[in-house]
């Protein structure tokens, strides 16, 4: 089950990123984290920006409401989103 934490008016959860995938998509849950496939390479923050855009698109929130808290150089990241609910995050998985 996806581990989602409420922190004030924000939701924090883990994401497992697979860069250089064939398409940008959300692939369910992986060991408590949201599994995300991105076409962008993990170079010059391209994958991180692609992740922010993909999550914002699926959650129908502005890209500015999605922030990577930790793991900027790792496949496993902690992400904070504002303007949505924990239930909505769980539905992505």
Residue positions per predicted region:
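Contiguous, often N-terminal, cationic amphipathic patches that form binding interfaces
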Residues: 1-52, 58-63, 67-73, 77-93
């Amino acid at each position: 089950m996806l581990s989602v934490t409420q922190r004030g008016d924000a939701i924090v959860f883990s994401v497992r990123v697979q860069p250089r995938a064939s398409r940008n998509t959300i692939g369910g849950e992986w060991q408590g984290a949201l599994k995300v496939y991105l076409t962008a390479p993990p170079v010059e923050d391209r994958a991180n920006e692609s992740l922010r855009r993909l999550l914002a698109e699926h959650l129908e929130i502005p890209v500015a409401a999605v922030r990577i808290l930790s793991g900027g150089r790792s496949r496993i990241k902690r992400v904070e989103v504002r303007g949505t609910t924990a239930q909505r995050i769980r539905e992505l998985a």
